[in-house]
Amino acid sequence: IENNLNKKALVIGAGGVSPSVILSIKKSGIKNISVTNRTNEKCIFLKKKFNFLTIIPWADLKSEIRNFDVIINATSLGLKNGDDFNFNFASTKNEVIYIDTIYNPLETKTFKYLKEEGRKVFNGLDMFIYQGQKSFYLWNKVNPEIDDELVELLNSRLK
């Protein structure tokens, strides 16, 4: 993500992965970070941890989604055989970057839609791989190499 100073990011979801996602966004230089969740209390909890967050009510998501440059799905929506968002993302900016923390399936319905519309999309596979690498190192003090062969193997197994 380039020229982050004036970018606006939205984290959809306020569960377990959200704090790490928020910190990563902040480290990238994006200053304007919002969060939304089906349960508003979880957003309020995150706002207490990260006072710089703006809370977007879930009911306003459909109309607000067009205001963001980076959108991260940190919910369970789209998981294998699971529900997906009950609205589409047609009003997102053409240059939006959509990141889905889900890696199984590799492409959720929302991911597929945005990809077909020509938006930049990334799934959660890299996060999964590098999280595994870090965990392996913490347990074994060995840093396993991540190469194209490993990525292809995981891609084939998750399809």
Regions found by a protein language model. Give the residues of each.
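Glycine-rich helix-loop-beta junction characteristic of Rossmann-like nucleotide cofactor-binding loops
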Residues: I1-N4, A90-T92
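Glycine-rich adenosine-cofactor-binding loop
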Residues: L5-K26, I30
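Hydrophobic Val/Ile/Leu positions in short beta-strands of Rossmann-like dinucleotide-binding domains
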Residues: V11-I12, V35, D100
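Short, well-ordered alpha-helices that flank and scaffold nucleotide-derived cofactor binding pockets
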Residues: L23-K27, F45-K48, K112, E116
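NAD(P)-binding Rossmann-fold cofactor-contacting core
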Residues: S28-F50
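Rossmann-like adenosine-cofactor binding region
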Residues: L53-V121
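Rossmann-fold NAD(P)-binding glycine/threonine-rich loop
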Residues: V96-L153
